[in-house]
Amino acid sequence: PLLKCVNLMFTSTGLRAAGSNGNCIVTARGDNQSTGDVSLLIPAASLGKLSNMCQDKDEFRVGTTGKSIVFFRENFLFSARLMEGGYIDTDQLVGSIRNAFTVLTDIHDMRAALSSVLSIGTGNRVKLNFQDQRLVFQCAGDCVSASAPIEVIALTGTPAGDYWFNAKQLVTCLKALSGTVTLGIAQGGMLTLATQDAYYL
């Protein structure tokens, strides 16, 4: 799974969540009406089961009972065991990231291009080649190679260079996003993906 645990935070500005699998950090914004001053650690597998049993439009009341968190609404109750321990300050971490350049593009186009080059099945790495207003996805093997370009809009800096990423992790991240995305390359060739409600690092 992408995440092992999720830090669920009820803040003064609404519901927030953060998680990491050691290679990728994800933050997301939820309902702005769910305010408070509580931070909880929940197994990602438990939240995954809950999401499979409901839809985005469903609304729940949330409470804690000892070492468990309970989500409930009419004729439905779901309980998950809370995890102990602290969590990294993701706001501070994300705020420290400085992108060398950023571009605006469409998640659907990125998914289609990535799927196209991975169809040759030559491994688990994909190269992202930035050429100003174009982003080219590339994969290569001993006897075969594939590339798929998409149009991007340069926002900051000068998009240029080749960057290699884990294809499986990139596929997983893109599946969870939709609409337009601000894609950036930070220090050390780190990839950042930012949408209106989520941030992937």
Set out the residue ranges of the language-model regions.
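Specificity-determining recognition surfaces
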Residues: 89-92
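DNA polymerase processivity clamps
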Residues: 1-83, 96-201
